[in-house]
Each structure stands twice: as C-alpha cells, then as structure tokens.
C-alpha cells in the first residue's frame, strides 16, 4: 500500500477515547515493571550462584569453618531467592488477571436503542400516506442482512476444512470487527439512508450497533441507495474495540421482548380475521366485485403482513447471529486481552515486486496462527495504531466486495435502478487490491518462515540423533588414539633404550671403571643425603610443634566465629520476618483468586441464561411457523370473503369498528412500549452502575499491584543488603586471616624469646646450685669454728676474755657474706642453716 493512502494518525486515534489509551499505557507500564523485576531477580540469582568461595585456596585447614558459614549463607540466599521467584510469579499471574479485567472494563458498550415507534408500526394507513420507498425497504433489509451473513460466514469459515484450526485463529473475527469499526469511523457518509429506512437499517446492523445514530442527511425519493459498508454511517462504541457480553445479552433480551410483542400483535390480527370469517359466513351467498377503496386497504394489509413476517425472520436470524457471536466471544475473553495484535511497520515498505508476488498467490488465503507467529505479532505490538486500522480496512473491504456480489445475486431487481458516478469509487477499489496483495505477501512470508522453521527443527533433530550416535564413537576413538599414542611412546622409549644399550655394551669395558668411580661417588652422596634426611626429620618435628601452636590459635579464632554465628542468627530472624511478610502476600493472592472464582461463577450463570434464551427462541420459532400456517389459511378464507364483503354496507360498518378497535389496541401497545422503554433505561442505568463498580475494583487491583511491586523492590533491597553483609563478612574473614598470619609471626618470635629465657633460667639455676653449695660449706666451717671457740673458752680464762670479741668479729663477717648472698636471692626462706638471730641483725650491721 502506498503511503498516500495511509490515514493520519490523529484521524484514527480520534475514534479511540483517551481513557482507553491511558489505561492501555498503564497496563503496559505495569507489565514492563514486572518484566524488569523478573530480570533483576534472575540477575540476582545468577550473581548469587556465581559468588566465589573466597579464601579457600591458600590455607584450607585454617578456613574450614568460614567455608561452612559461607555455604550456610549461600543456602539461605538461594532459599530466599526461590521464595522471591514464587512471589514474583504470583505477582505476574495477578497482573495478567488484572489486565484481563481491565480489558473487560475497557470494552464497555451500551445496549442498542431501537426506534420502537418506527420499527413496530402496525397501523393501517391508506395508500396516499405511504412513501415511495416502501417497495425498496424489504430488499434493503435483505441486502443488509446478507452482508451481515457474509461477514459472519467469512469470520466463521476463514480457514480451509483440511487444516486444524488452533484456538488462536479466532482472533481474525475480532480483527474483522475492528476493521469494520475503523472503516465506519473514518469513512465520510456519502449517502445516508432515508428516515423511513432507518428502522430496517438499525435492525440489520444490530450485530454491530450499540449506540444511537448520529445526524443523517435526507435523500430524494427517486435516488436509489447503494448499501456499501463505507456509505452507511454506523456508530460504534466509545470505550473500546470489543463488545461487552453483558450488553449483548441485554440486547438479546430486548429483541426477545419485541418478538413477544409481535406475537401479541399477530394474535390480535387473527382474532380480527376470525370476526371477518364470522361476518362472511352470514353473508357468504352474496358475491360482488370489491370497491376500489376496500381493495386498496386489503392490499396494504397483505403488504404489512409480509413486512411483519420478514421483520420477524430478520429478528430471529439476528438473535441467532448474536448468540453465535456470544459463543465466539466467550472463549476469546481471555485470549483477546492478551493478543492485541498489531502488524509491523514493514507493511508500509513493500515493493512492487512483492505486491506482484502477493497477487499471484491469492489462493492461499489463510495461515494457521502458531505460537511463533503470535510471539512475532507480540514483538511488533508497539507499532502505531493507524497501520492496524489501515490493514483492517483493507481486509474488511474484501469482505464488502464479497457481500456486494451476494447482494447482486439475490436481488438484481433492486440494483438495476442504482446509478452513481464511478469516479467516486476508484480509490476505494484501488485500496483493497494493494491491501490484498500485502496481506497475501505477509501470508506467504509467514508460510515460508513456518516451512523454514519446520526444516530447521527436522535438521536439528537429525543433528541431535547423529550427535548422540557419534558421542560413544568419539569416546572410543579418543581412547584408542590415547592408547596408540601411549604404545608409540613406549616403542620410541624402547627403541632408544635398545640403541643406548647397544652403545653401552660396545663401550662397557671402557665405562666399567668410570662406573665404579661413579658408584663410589653415589655412595658418598647417599651418606650425605642420609644426614640431610635426619636433619629434615628434626625440622618436621619442630613443624609439628608449630602446628600444635597454630591449632591453639585456631581455637582462639573459633571463639570469634561464634560471634559471627550470633550475627547469622540475627540474619535468620530477619529472614523469618521476611517469610512472614511473604505469607501475608500469599493470603492477599488467595483473596484475589477467590474474587476470580466469583467472576467465573457469574460467567457460568450467564451461560445458563443463554441456554434458556436459546430454548425460548426455539419455542418462539415453532409458534411463528404455526402462526404462518394459520395466516395462510386465513388469507385463503379472506379471498373468498372479499367478494361477499363488497355487497354489504353493514360489513363496511363492522370493518370500521374493527379498525377503531385495532387503533385502540395499537395505542395500548404504544403505552406498553413506553413502559418497556422506561424499564430498559432503568436496566441500562443499573448496568452502568455495575460497570462503574467494576472500574473501581480495577483501580483497587491496580493499587494492590503497586503495593506488591513496592514490596518486591523492598525485598530486592533486602537481598542487596544481605549481599553487602556477606561482602563485609568476607572482608572480615580476610582481616582475620591477615591477623592469623601476624599472630603466627608473633608466636614464632615468642617461641624464640621463650627458648632464650629458658636458657637464661637454666644458667640462673646453675648459679643458684653453686651458691647453695658454697653456703653449705660456709655453714660447716662456721660450726667447726664455733666448736673450736667453745673448746678454747673452756681451756683458759684469758681465752674467755678474748672470745667475746672474736665471736663478734666472726658474727660480723658471716653477716656480711650472708647479705652479699641475699642480694642475689630475693627469698629468705631458701637460706638454710643460718640462725634466726643473725638474720634479724642483718639490716643494722649492713648500715654500719
């Protein structure tokens, strides 16, 4: 399609209300936020799964328990992420359900408002009051109804019978409806119908009309009316592209009430005919020609009866078509909300060769919609809306042409007098051809892509089978190659050894002496290595001691790990709190599911009402057939009575009386119609209130969604905080490992200092032993000297005089030596053999 035929985006978007666009944008934003949350959760999961176990390579024995703590943390994180994924899945389910509810509330359509005063006119007027278009009214209704039938047949039988129709193929019906609505909104009214033809048009288009008509311009009576989809101004709903099932059911009920009214009218007519029969039986022997005025009135009655039968047939057909539409729309309520199918912008860029290619392949009309095609259509769903409306317009004009052909085949007499200039319809004929070519090109492109996909899947399956067959062969070949390489290496080594042995054997005599020398050197080196081995064993013993010391330091670190475990307990408490919040979210989800079940129950009740309506329709059809048979009998009797009625003036008076009675009955019926219209308006107000309540519920669901998204963000923040805590713990583990190395170095230094101190203590103990030995010798000398002094005192008196001075001298000398020894010995209890009196005198004598 050339870009010149594209409508302006504003013109197309003008038919769509701004509320509908705003709500769709809100739904898209909610879905985008949910997809972002899901992607972030997947990224968190991947980052959490790919976290390296830090600090496990260098010192495994020192970090066994930190590894276990990290594993516990990772398990907790994985469980928390699994719970989070479940909550996100539940949130996505709630979002999908809310989007369905939003689509249902967006698709609000008012019930059809029929012009009851014009559609149910059963009064008997003379021929002077009749318009010229009464003869054209019946074929117009036929043509309009045939157009509705062709539309429904095209929407029903879109695929060939050989192909299996998937459930997604029913989207074409909705696309056709959308195309019809866009064409009706965008096409200017070329020739509107006359005011006398409005009831038939409203009746024939009741499948697609759910709002009162706009202003219509009158046409002169001589000009015929072309019943094309673009010429008729059919208003469509303001709130969406799809009809609401509740409104359709209400329209079915309204039409059923009209049928009952028509039945009542027919019963009244039959009663009048029975009165005619009674009058005719009294005056049956009189046979005269009818008066012209009576004949004209009776012809008008016949025409009115024919019109009533046709209108009843039209009503029954319309009700059946509405029920078929309802049966189609019920399974599509869930799928259409998810599949707002928009075509790609590539439709604008088709070349002339591609158009020619599409014209050649006109026979291949329909392609089964597969899951891949649906994904492609979803991928291109962000295209502008005017491309979709243009393509739907092209599709619908193809169906209009088929409907026009069907109209011409049924009623050629009505279309002979229709003459309009051809120049007005040239662009309308060019547009469908190009749209047909583009549609066929897209269908062929989809078919080729499907065939390529099938081939690719078959080749991939064959490749997988061959790979599975090749795997054991590859393993066996690799094992054989490895064995051959090993054998070749062995053969090479054996050949080299053989050559070396031959050379050695040739030089054995010369090298024996050198070998003996080398053996001696080897023995000497062996002895040296034995000494080194002993040294290494001693070093190993020292290392074992150091290992014990390290174990003690590890015990010290375990105490620190207990603290970290207490911190982990705090984290577990936080996790339990998060689990409680998740359970609360689950309860809210259960409430949403209960509400969904209530909605499903309401739909089930609607289906039951539909089945009852269908049974009532069947009964009404049977009654209509019986009434038709009765009317035929009555008409035959009327023809026999006409000759007798003309002769009697009394019969004229009775006919006038019956006419007055019919007018009175007509007035009563009109009053009843007014009451029914009032009841209908009250029912419409009730339905509007229910729709408002549904909108408020959707707003509540949106708020719940926003709260759930906020809670998901809070959960993601908590996960990020836990990750940060893990990183902090890892850094602390690094610090602890560094401190362990420092402690090890300090322990090695302390061991060296300890060895030095032990050596120093041993030297001090040796000195102590030597001093004790000297003290004992001095005590012995002291005792011997005291004995000598006592013996000398006993021997002579002179010696007694001098002995006191000598005793004091020796006492002072011993006290001095004891004081010098006490400077090296801080404890006085170790001085054995010294008298207590001398020990008490020491400070005074040292001061002297």
Curated annotation (Swiss-Prot):
Compartment list: Nucleus
The name this protein goes by in its record: Coiled-coil domain-containing protein 110
Coiled coil segments of this chain: 442-794
Domain of life: Eukaryota
Species per Swiss-Prot/TrEMBL record: Mus musculus (Mouse)
GO cellular component: nucleus
Residues where Phosphoserine is found: 620
Residues spanning the signal sequence: none
Region (Disordered) residue spans: 41-62
Keywords for the protein's UniProt record, in alphabetical order: Coiled coil, Nucleus, Phosphoprotein
Record has Isomerase as a keyword: no
